[in-house]
């Protein structure tokens, strides 16, 4: 699904980004162009990947790198926000805390 004003006109930009990693790209179910400036991708219908306006290719590649090395996208993530330069803000779908051991 492709949405957002100007999305069709910017499809080549999106395809260049997605071409950086076919494994992740194949599981992107939606791409939304925000304010005709940056892309927001939906991965496997539940994780949002917000790419920055500047150098989205580098940010997408970083996600792919971390997924390959640490299995980043195997986690139940609600959002990966890459809009802040040199930062990755991850929002969990649910937070599971370990049970308290009363025997200690």
Map each language-model feature to its residues.
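Charged, solvent-exposed interaction patches on well-folded alpha/beta domains
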Residues: 1-104
């Amino acid at each position: 699904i492709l949405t957002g004003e100007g999305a069709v006109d910017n499809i080549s930009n999106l395809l260049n980004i997605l071409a950086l990693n076919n494994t992740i790209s194949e599981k992107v179910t939606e791409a939304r162009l925000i304010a005709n400036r940056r892309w927001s991708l939906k991965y496997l219908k539940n994780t949002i990947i917000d790419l920055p306006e500047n150098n989205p290719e580098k940010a997408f590649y970083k996600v792919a790198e971390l997924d390959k090395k640490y299995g980043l996208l195997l986690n139940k993530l609600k959002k990966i926000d890459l809009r802040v330069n040199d930062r990755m803000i991850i929002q969990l779908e649910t937070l599971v805390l370990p049970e308290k051991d009363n025997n200690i």
